[in-house]
Regions:
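Extreme N-terminal leader/targeting segments of oxidoreductases
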Residues: 1-48
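N-terminal Rossmann-like FAD-binding beta1-loop-alpha1 element of flavoenzymes
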Residues: 48-73
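Glycine-rich FAD pyrophosphate-binding loop
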Residues: 66-86
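Dinucleotide-binding Rossmann-like beta1-alpha1 core, especially the glycine-rich loop
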Residues: 94-177
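Active-site substrate-recognition segment that forms the wall
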Residues: 123, 131-139, 226, 240-280, ...
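Helix-loop-beta segment of a Rossmann-like dinucleotide-binding subdomain
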Residues: 135-145, 177-208, 317-320
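Helical element adjacent to the flavin cofactor pocket in flavoenzyme catalytic cores
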Residues: 161-162, 186-244
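C-terminal catalytic lobe of FAD-dependent flavoproteins
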Residues: 320-440, 450
């Protein structure tokens, strides 16, 4: 099918250019070489086994550096080859929940504690990338939350009030006319901006961190999937790993591995990328010359930022495909997202989007992560439903520090929010009756807009994770 084009004031507009269905981050792996990690083909033993090479698993592994322990990491794809390496690479504490939603759910003090977790995740990633000079397109980009309509304006105002209530001072709000100074868009009614956030190529980041782990003596086996776990031993297709402690940080956890699979749900989004923008296009997008990572106030929101080589990365979805049980791979969804973007940026109608790819992220019913230690498997910790790179990074570090006995203070602070024993409005078993997509759709909307939580006192007995 050939591209269709039209002309508007001398500009050629190509809204239906055929896009290649391919993860752009995979394409960028051709730029730098990384260590080859063959599959596991023998039986080995270690002190700590980490299953999963996304941001949770890699962050957990990094906690064991220079601890004198034998650490092994296995990944069914390449490190970063699953959800983490298909993401937009936003390093922001915002994910599925805005700060004002956390304040409503938990109160000001608790919301501040929760918000601190992804902020620590960002600090951990950025400091490591800078310390070891890992080349992965790291860019400092302020976050800009964009309101649509009167509801979006109210959300922006609520976010401002909540940021002030928890003590943040770096935020700035914009009305529709003021937004024109920093964003060449139309149709947004308000915005709130804050700093301390970044963009990164997530796949290059994880591959670079993998190389760092290997250089420090860790064993990494790619193309090695966990088939089952029996006490202290994880079985793969061609080998086994027996470990004193095991951290399982995988997405799309199979039911056969653990009933904790019932705690995870999927949200699907789509991403697309353009050719590098010209200087003129960059000035249209960000008139002030300051790059930002942006997202809007829709329930299924659209989001965009620039990459290190000045390509526009644009993502979003639809209410239907977001909650589907199985992956849906069709360019029609991202074309609608692109069409909506062009309605806000008519001067960028001629941008050429060259690649697109879908991705399913793991989430929980209330949109906060779960860290769990199953009864009878006290040496095993699961990390589930971390939406956003900073959240995953913090949770991986947190789980590892619990193994090391170095997280008592953080445990008392965070067990309320991350334990799978916390209160959920709708039970996971309801998914077997009405289906997991419908259950997640209901629970997701409730958590975002209505849920109010009651905090528990720390248990005096054995820790929950």
């Amino acid at each position: 099918m050939s591209a269709t084009s039209s002309h508007d004031l001398g500009r050629t507009i190509v809204p239906n250019t055929r896009m290649v269905n391919q993860n752009w981050w995979i394409t960028t792996l051709l730029i730098n070489s990384h260590k080859y990690c063959p599959p596991l083909t023998r039986d080995i033993e270690c002190d700590v086994l980490i299953v999963g090479g996304g941001f949770s698993g890699i962050s957990a592994a990094a906690e064991f550096l220079r601890k004198g322990l034998r650490v092994v990491l296995i990944e069914k794809n390449i490190v970063g080859g699953s959800s983490s390496g298909r993401s937009a690479g936003f390093l922001t504490p915002d994910s599925e929940l805005e700060l004002h939603q956390l304040v409503r759910r938990y109160g000001t003090a608790a919301a501040a504690e929760i918000w601190e977790a992804p902020c620590r995740g960002i600090e951990r990633i950025v400091s490591t990338l800078k310390k070891y000079d890992i080349q992965c397109g790291l860019l400092q980009q302020d976050s800009l939350f964009l309101g649509l309509g009167s509801g979006g304006t109210e959300a922006v105002e609520s976010e401002r009030e909540c940021r002030e209530s928890v003590g943040f001072t770096d935020q700035r709000t914009y009305d529709a006319s003021q937004l024109q100074q920093i964003l060449g868009a139309q149709g947004y009614t308000a915005g709130i901006r804050y700093g301390g956030t970044y963009g990164v190529n997530p796949l290059q980041c994880l591959q670079g961190l993998k190389d760092l782990l290997i250089d420090n003596g860790m064993q990494v086996f790619e193309s090695t999937e966990m088939d089952r776990i029996d006490d202290h031993t994880v079985y793969t297709h061609a080998g086994t790993v027996t470990a004193q402690n095991i951290i399982i940080a995988v997405d799309k956890l199979p039911d056969a591995i653990s009933p904790l699979a019932d705690e995870t749900f999927h949200a699907q989004t789509f991403l697309s990328v353009t050719e590098p923008l010209t200087d003129r296009e960059l000035r249209i997008l960000f008139p002030s010359g300051e790059q930002m990572q942006c997202w809007d106030s829709k329930l299924v929101y659209s989001y965009f930022r620039l990459t290190g080589d000045n390509r526009l990365l644009l993502g979003g979805g639809t209410p239907v495909t977001t909650f589907l049980k199985d992956a849906y791979n069709n360019p029609g969804v991202i074309r609608r997202v692109i069409k909506d973007f062009r309605s806000h940026f008519p001067q960028l109608d001629d941008l050429s989007f060259i690649q697109f790819w879908p991705g399913q992220i793991d989430v929980t019913r209330d949109l906060l992560p779960v860290i769990a230690r199953p009864p009878g498997l006290e040496h095993v910790r699961f990390i589930l439903g971390c939406v956003g790179i900073p959240w995953a990074t913090f949770c991986g570090s947190f789980a590892a520090r619990n193994v090391l006995g170095e997280a008592d203070d953080d445990y008392r602070k965070y067990f309320n929010y991350f334990s799978n024993e916390r209160h959920f409005v709708l039970p996971s078993g309801l998914g077997k009756v009405i289906g997991k997509p419908l259950l997640f759709s209901l629970a997701n909307s409730w958590a975002k807009f209505y849920q109010v939580d009651t905090l528990r006192a720390p248990a005096e007995a054995q820790k929950e994770f």
